[in-house]
A protein has these predicted regions:
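ABC-family P-loop ATPase nucleotide-binding domain
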Residues: 163-173
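Conserved D-loop-proximal element of ABC-family nucleotide-binding domains
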Residues: 95-100, 145
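ABC-family P-loop ATPase nucleotide-binding domains
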Residues: 2-83
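Walker B catalytic motif
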Residues: 82, 86-93, 97
Length: 173
């Protein structure tokens, strides 16, 4: 998922997903779903992640609001079921209701068979998605790891203390 999902005029959401899913299934040695199976799966996943059915036939992200684009990405995750998903600042620009819906979708998709790397600059998203781990990147490296409490500490103190700690470690090496 992208911070700013791109629009692809002329490619419907449903055709994009049908093609992507067929390629994934072919890679796994599985036959493509027939039209009835695909539409049934699509309806199930739309319901699961609270995705507006009228968006599936529109061009991919074209004219979508920021929240609709993010919800569309969660719908894509539901349909494609990747084992690893990277959500790059998926909370960027979302109003609180959209943030709740997107977070609920991510939580419904979490399982022991997949992993999510969620990149965020704010603790707010973590009120809805409780992470197993929190890692702080600075200057291209992980400088601190912890639990949700680390995110709360960052919200309270900011990042400067970690930057200083990171510089001190770099000079002692």
């Amino acid at each position: 998922a992208f911070q700013y999902p791109i629009e692809i005029p002329g490619v419907s959401n449903i055709n994009f997903l049908k093609t992507a899913l067929a390629e994934i299934r072919a890679y796994k040695g599985l036959a493509p779903l027939d039209a009835k199976e695909f539409l049934q799966l699509s309806r199930e996943k739309q319901k699961l992640v609270e995705f507006d059915a009228k968006l599936v036939n529109r061009s991919l992200n074209e004219g979508f609001s920021g929240g609709e684009k993010k919800r569309n990405e969660i719908f894509q995750l539901a349909m494609l079921e990747p084992s690893l998903a990277i959500l790059d600042v998926t909370d960027s620009g979302l109003v609180i209701d959209a943030l709740r819906i997107v977070s609920k979708g991510v939580n419904k998709l979490r399982s022991s068979n997949n992993a999510f790397i969620i990149i965020t600059h704010y603790q707010r998203l973590l009120e809805y998605i409780v992470p197993d781990f929190v890692h702080v990147l600075y200057d291209g490296r992980i400088v601190k790891s912890g639990t949700k409490e680390l995110a709360l500490e960052l919200e309270e103190k900011g990042y400067d203390w970690l930057k200083e700690e990171s510089r001190e470690k770099a000079t002692t090496i």
